[in-house]
From Swiss-Prot:
(2S)-2-hydroxy-3-oxobutyl phosphate binds at residues 85-86, 127. This is 6,7-dimethyl-8-ribityllumazine synthase. Pathway: Cofactor biosynthesis; riboflavin biosynthesis; riboflavin from 2-hydroxy-3-oxobutyl phosphate and 5-amino-6-(D-ribitylamino)uracil: step 1/2. GO terms for molecular function: 6,7-dimethyl-8-ribityllumazine synthase activity. Signal peptide: none annotated. It comes from Persephonella marina (strain DSM 14350 / EX-H1). It catalyses: (2S)-2-hydroxy-3-oxobutyl phosphate + 5-amino-6-(D-ribitylamino)uracil = 6,7-dimethyl-8-(1-D-ribityl)lumazine + phosphate + 2 H2O + H(+). The gene is ribH. Its EC number is 2.5.1.78. Pfam families: DMRL_synthase (PF00885). One of its GO terms (biological process) is riboflavin biosynthetic process. PANTHER family: 6,7-DIMETHYL-8-RIBITYLLUMAZINE SYNTHASE, 6,7-DIMETHYL-8-RIBITYLLUMAZINE SYNTHASE DMRL SYNTHASE LUMAZINE SYNTHASE.
């Protein structure tokens, strides 16, 4: 039996982080977490490109554009969609989720999902580096592992 696993070394890997500016109190913390993860796992800030977009809804398009350049081993998507009193939350959350999944499938580049979808700002804060860890860090960790796994399979 053969088992293939991706390792957690970011050394020599190139990343693009696509981050929404909307709810930047949260998304900036997610970005800090993602960069921290890459550096802690042997990556270099010189191998990280950050692209800021207006909000989470715009993330899939730019993720696809950067993935198609062939410059990056993985794309990390970071954003925060916080429920309001309208159905807008459901529409945005669903479309962003579908869009990010499609980008990965269409480009065959790992695209990690670091989009917070929470009911309150407090829940978002908890997931951006306080009680519940930092989901930006988690998304970067997934991107590192998947980039290495793809290299192993190729």
């Amino acid at each position: 039996m053969t088992e293939i696993n991706g390792n957690l070394s970011a050394e020599g890997l190139n990343f693009c982080i696509v981050v929404g500016r909307f709810n930047d109190l949260i998304t900036n913390k997610l970005l800090e977490g993602a960069i921290d993860c890459i550096v802690r796992h042997g990556g270099s800030e010189d191998n990280i490109t950050v692209v800021r977009v207006p909000g989470s809804f715009e993330i899939p398009l730019i993720a696809k554009k950067v993935a198609k350049t062939g410059k990056y081993d993985a794309v990390i998507c970071l954003g925060a969609v916080i429920r309001g009193s309208t159905p807008h939350f459901e529409y945005v959350a669903a479309e962003v989720t579908k869009g990010i999944a499609l980008v990965s499938l269409e480009t065959e580049i790992p695209v990690s999902y670091g989009i917070l979808t929470t009911d309150t700002i407090e829940q978002a804060v908890e997931r951006a580096g306080t009680k519940m860890g930092n989901k930006g860090f988690d998304a970067a960790l997934s991107a590192i592992e998947m980039a290495n796994l793809i290299k192993e399979i190729r």
